[in-house]
């Protein structure tokens, strides 16, 4: 995106919303609390419940204000007084989700608050009808082209108001939402940026803007207001963009300046650790959060993902039952129950609960991705592809959906499609070894072996989660008859798994020892060959080969065959694996500069 397309000049707009000063200074927490309490009330009056809740939770984390410092409610304008009866009635209808009825009684109102509720009621009415049609007529996996029919009319009306500079911060927010829904992304970004300047304390505008930012470069070109709210926005967008180190630093700074009791910040830190697969840390933080806020449901689906990965059935069962008691019809609750059934390998039931979650909120990203995983388990690749595609429609930054699509096309033996989707996943998670190993396998199938080498080595260099990159790289060197490089990879693999004490599948370990035994035997390095052959005897699939090789080594030694001192060996075996401490010749480490990205 060009810089000029994202930088907007903000002109004054007519507004009945009180001026809300919001500098970037955190030194006056009392003033920040006043601002949060005020914006919580203003958003609540307009039916923006999530923004109101966010502001109220953040305000609650700060020290209480004395009576003398509590702000009076905003003054009522002449227009507000004229529309008071209609607004009061319409807001009651709005609160019980009778949106058309609310809009009917607000038609013709002139105050900014009543006008926003009128337009917002029309928008939500269209969204509700669209969702009803999606669920009832087509089902959650056949969303098709169902649209909110009210969007175009709303855009025309809001555009006229915008050109006349008659939209306040809330009106700009709604205009941006309408533009985003119509896929007018560039225009939506400009309007949301304008909304943050006009009303910087409205979290909803920041959040909508966050959903449209695709990379860090795009973020640099935004002309954002210099406000303390910007710090919360940056922490959130860094988490979304997988810039976890920067995100954690931002959240730590916010804790240091006085928001240490904020459950929102604590939950975001847990999500950040989840994103970098620091499972122990994330679990610990979520458990602490549950103690502080036992009835919290937000982010509990992420908590359940961690319990799922660790196969903690009893803890996941307890969480599912607990959330059912709190609110069984929340999206997060359905996802937690789905994860519970998935862990028990009841994939049909799991998919059913993810579908229930999508009936409650068709734009809930986690449910689409998890349902795709379940269809993969059920070998229903076409349904899995649809689910993953819906997840990408909701959020193009979801690497799990791109990775899932790569896996489905790998099953369908379509390597070029597979390569495309794995590349997209890798772009979003450049330091995730799983994406790199998947890319390497794709390149290998396409006979692009140099690229495959790069991917496997890079996967090892960034921290191989599954401990498979070196094995795959070694097998690739075997295939290319690069015996010394293959041996070095196998030795490094063995050193790694023995140094961390991790239990691995026997097939991988035995494969490494079998190759090394044969390699050292060819090099006439009897001690090393004997040590590896003895290790082969510990595994069923290599036991006979190991015994045969030991007999050959013994026979050659009895015949007086001397070990070689000229043929190079990769480097020493770990001391615990060597038959003795007899030194062997060591060559320079493997030169991987030619295959390192």
Curated annotation (Swiss-Prot):
InterPro entries: APC8 (IPR007192), TPR-like_helical_dom_sf (IPR011990), TPR_rpt (IPR019734). It comes from the Eukaryota. TPR repeats lie at residues 27-63, 73-112, 114-144, 169-200, 229-259, 263-293, 297-327, 331-361, 366-395, 400-432, 433-466, 468-500, 504-540. Signal peptide: none annotated. The modification N6-acetyllysine is found at residue 467. There is a cross-link at residue 147 (Glycyl lysine isopeptide (Lys-Gly) (interchain with G-Cter in SUMO2)). The modification Phosphotyrosine is found at residue 273. The modification Phosphoserine is found at residues 578, 588, 593. The modification N-acetylalanine is found at residue 2. Keywords: Acetylation, Cell cycle, Cell division, Isopeptide bond, Mitosis, Phosphoprotein, Repeat, TPR repeat, Ubl conjugation, Ubl conjugation pathway. One of its GO terms (biological process) is protein ubiquitination. The mammalian APC/C is composed at least of 14 distinct subunits ANAPC1, ANAPC2, CDC27/APC3, ANAPC4, ANAPC5, CDC16/APC6, ANAPC7, CDC23/APC8, ANAPC10, ANAPC11, CDC26/APC12, ANAPC13, ANAPC15 and ANAPC16 that assemble into a complex of at least 19 chains with a combined molecular mass of around 1.2 MDa; APC/C interacts with FZR1 and FBXO5. Interacts with FBXO43; the interaction is direct. PANTHER family: CELL DIVISION CYCLE 16,23,27, CELL DIVISION CYCLE PROTEIN 23 HOMOLOG. Belongs to the APC8/CDC23 family. This is Cell division cycle protein 23 homolog. It comes from Bos taurus. The lineage of its organism: Eukaryota, Metazoa, Chordata, Craniata, Vertebrata. The gene is CDC23.
């Amino acid at each position: 995106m060009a810089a000029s397309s994202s930088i907007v000049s903000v002109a004054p707009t007519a507004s009945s919303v009180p001026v809300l000063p919001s500098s970037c200074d955190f030194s006056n927490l009392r003033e920040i609390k006043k601002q949060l309490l005020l914006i919580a009330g203003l958003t609540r009056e307009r039916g923006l419940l999530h923004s109101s809740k966010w502001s109220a939770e953040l305000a609650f984390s700060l020290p209480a204000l004395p009576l003398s410092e509590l702000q009076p409610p905003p003054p009522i304008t002449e227009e507000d007084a004229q529309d008071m009866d209609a607004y009061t009635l319409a807001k009651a209808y709005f609160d019980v989700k009778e949106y058309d009825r609310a809009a009917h009684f607000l038609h013709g109102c002139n105050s900014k608050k009543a006008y926003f509720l009128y337009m917002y009621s029309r928008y939500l009415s269209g969204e509700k009808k669209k969702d009803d049609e999606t669920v009832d007529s087509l089902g959650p996996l056949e969303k098709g082209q169902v649209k909110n029919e009210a969007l175009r009319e709303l855009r025309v009306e809001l555009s006229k108001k915008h050109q006349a500079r008659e939209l306040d911060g809330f009106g700009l927010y709604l205009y941006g939402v309408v533009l985003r829904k119509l896929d007018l992304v560039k225009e939506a970004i400009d309007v949301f940026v304008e909304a943050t300047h006009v009303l910087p304390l409205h979290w909803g505008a920041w959040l909508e803007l966050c959903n449209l930012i695709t990379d860090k470069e795009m973020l640099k070109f935004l002309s954002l207001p210099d406000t303390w709210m910007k710090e919360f926005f940056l922490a959130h967008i860094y988490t979304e963009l997988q810039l976890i180190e920067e995100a954690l630093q931002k959240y730590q700074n916010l804790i240091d300046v006085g928001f240490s009791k904020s459950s929102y910040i604590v939950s975001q830190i847990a999500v950040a650790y989840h994103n970098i697969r620091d499972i122990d840390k994330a679990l610990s933080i979520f458990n602490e959060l549950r103690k502080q806020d036992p009835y919290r449901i937000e982010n509990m689906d992420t908590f359940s993902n961690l319990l799922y990965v660790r196969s903690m059935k009893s803890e996941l069962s307890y969480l599912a039952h607990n959330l059912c008691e709190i609110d069984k019809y929340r999206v997060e609750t359905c996802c937690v129950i789905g994860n519970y059934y998935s862990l028990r390998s009841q994939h049909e039931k799991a998919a059913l609960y993810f579908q229930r979650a999508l009936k409650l909120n068709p734009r809930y990203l986690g449910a689409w991705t998890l349902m795709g995983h379940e269809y993969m388990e059920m070998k229903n690749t076409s349904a899995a592809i649809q689910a993953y595609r819906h997840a990408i429609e909701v959020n193009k930054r979801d690497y799990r959906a791109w990775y899932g699509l790569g896996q489905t096309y790998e099953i369908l033996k379509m390597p070029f499609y597979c390569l495309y989707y794995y590349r997209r996943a890798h772009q979003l998670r450049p330091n995730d070894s799983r994406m790199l190993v998947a890319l390497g396998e794709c390149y290998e199938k396409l006979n692009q072996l140099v690229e495959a080498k790069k991917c496997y080595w890079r996967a090892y260099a960034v921290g191989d989660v599954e401990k498979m990159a070196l094995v795959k790289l070694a097998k690739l060197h075997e295939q290319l008859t690069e015996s010394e490089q293959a041996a070095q990879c196998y030795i490094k693999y063995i050193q790694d798994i023995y140094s961390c004490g991790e239990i691995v599948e026997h097939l991988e370990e035995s494969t490494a020892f079998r190759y090394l035994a044969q390699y050292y035997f060819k090099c006439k390095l009897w001690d090393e060959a004997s040590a590896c052959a003895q290790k082969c005897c510990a595994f069923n699939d290599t036991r006979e080969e190991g015994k045969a090789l030991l007999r050959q080594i013994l026979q050659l030694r009895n015949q007086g065959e001397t070990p070689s001192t000229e043929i190079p060996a990769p480097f020493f075996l770990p001391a615990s694996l060597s038959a003795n401490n007899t030194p062997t010749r060591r060559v320079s480490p493997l030169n991987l500069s030619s295959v390192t990205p």
